[in-house]
Amino acid sequence: MTITPPPSDTEVSVLENKNLGRITQIIGPVLDVVFPPGKMPYIYNALIVQGRDTVGKQINVTCEVQQLLGNNRIRAVAMSATDGLKRGMEVIDTGAALSVPVGGATLGRIFNVLGEPIDNLGPVDTRTTSPIHRSAPAFIQLDTQLSIFETGIKVVDLLAPYRRGGKIGLFGGAGVGKTVLIMELINNIAKAHGGVSVFGGVGERTREGNDLYMEMKESRVINEKNIAESKVALVYGQMNEPPGARMRVGLTALTMAEYFRDVNEQDVLLFIDNIFRFVQAGSEVSALLGRMPSAVGYQPTLGTEMGTLQERITSTKEGSITSIQAVYVPADDLTDPAPATTFAHLDATTVLSRGLAAKGIYPAVDPLDSTSTMLQPRIVGEEHYETAQRVKQTLQRYKELQDMIAILGLDEVSEEDRLTVARARKIERFFSQPFFVAEVFTGSPGKYVGLAETIRGFQLILSGELDSLPEQAFYLVGNIDEATAKATNLT
């Protein structure tokens, strides 16, 4: 991390004293630049192309050095459109990697890959900046304790608990509640853990990024009246950006998250939507740089690039970065190298189900498809593990019986199976929960349910103590006491 002094009147552009080169070739977003002998820039140095296009408009394009070609030539990838550039234009070597603003000044704001604000809310305090390229924390700095990251969301905490400093894959199509779940997690980490969140929009639709920003303002995750009280920083490199920007925007978001972890010593939630687009952008850049493609046309450095990003997402003795990554699976092929490489890094998967969303059960997390490496007796304890397994067995049996019930009717199944079905339906409804960020839409106050309360609630349903209560009493409530109170009001 570097502290940049504030600009003064006497300050002449420091870039004038840097190495100067000239563009010799432009192929889309890739530039070849020649520098004077002995003045070659380092790999990952930021270069700036300044000049005017054919109509006299000012050009300011930032590039990143990717290859040293020999004969004093380098190859760089542009972070913005190269329209208007021409051979012979002057290129300035900044002498350092891309650096972005970090700290409290980033909260409530939207940035591009270069750390420039793009929300029309004025400049950002850039006195504290940090380079986007840095090493993963050393082994000695890592926190080796396996601890649960409590989210306050019943279905997640019980069946697919998140690891503090872990990586979670979020699978879900359009309209099943991915955005609302993301916003609730951002809200809960701020309230329960005193933490902040960073959202990295990598290669997704600009409209979705805009919708997320508007919904965050509406649900007060971003506080318009006092921007410093916001709980999230947003970094966007959407699908209309050049591949260089989409490849690096994840690192920009991660750099902002690392400052909150290492300097502010906070728990941070890092969202990456979509991790597949990070790989896709790397594949495009690799082809443009002339590398031989690997399996299915991906870059030969796929595993290294993914590891460089993922290994920086971890818990240290200062704080933690817990990452939730939306994963697009091309053609639903889980063996595709991009998702397969991602899975190797994940600690848990949260799968959203369209069937549950159609039933009105939100969050629509599929209890049988969602998994976690943390769900082991030695980590979560025997009580939690046993309760989770019994819940899964009940739901699995209900799933097996559904076809039979649809054909023959509920009267044709055994008494024991009827009891299983009744309890499974109560469990399914009890997984639903009113969210804080959805209060403005539903009118129901949000509920944060602690892990102990969650376990107690499901144990009571499984024990049969609540068999007499109607199943609608369990729908959209917080803890089990609210369900029993609701049942009293229903009768």
From Swiss-Prot:
GO biological process, one term: proton motive force-driven mitochondrial ATP synthesis
InterPro entries hit by this protein: AAA+_ATPase, ATP-synt_VA_C, ATP_synth_F1_bsu, ATPase_a/bsu_AS, ATPase_alpha/beta_chains, ATPase_F1/V1/A1_a/bsu_N, ATPase_F1/V1/A1_a/bsu_N_sf, ATPase_F1/V1/A1_a/bsu_nucl-bd
E.C. code: 7.1.2.2
Catalysed transformations (reactions): ATP + H2O + 4 H(+)(in) = ADP + phosphate + 5 H(+)(out)
Listed SUPFAM superfamilies: C-terminal domain of alpha and beta subunits of F1 ATP synthase, N-terminal domain of alpha and beta subunits of F1 ATP synthase, P-loop containing nucleoside triphosphate hydrolases
Subcellular location: Plastid, Chloroplast thylakoid membrane
Residues annotated for ATP binding in this entry: G172, G173, A174, G175, V176, G177, K178, T179
Membrane topology: Peripheral membrane protein
Major place of residence: plastid
Gene Ontology CC: chloroplast thylakoid membrane; mitochondrion; proton-transporting ATP synthase complex
One GO molecular-function entry: proton-transporting ATP synthase activity, rotational mechanism
Family: Belongs to the ATPase alpha/beta chains family.
Function: Produces ATP from ADP in the presence of a proton gradient across the membrane. The catalytic sites are hosted primarily by the beta subunits.
Annotated protein name in UniProt: ATP synthase subunit beta, chloroplastic
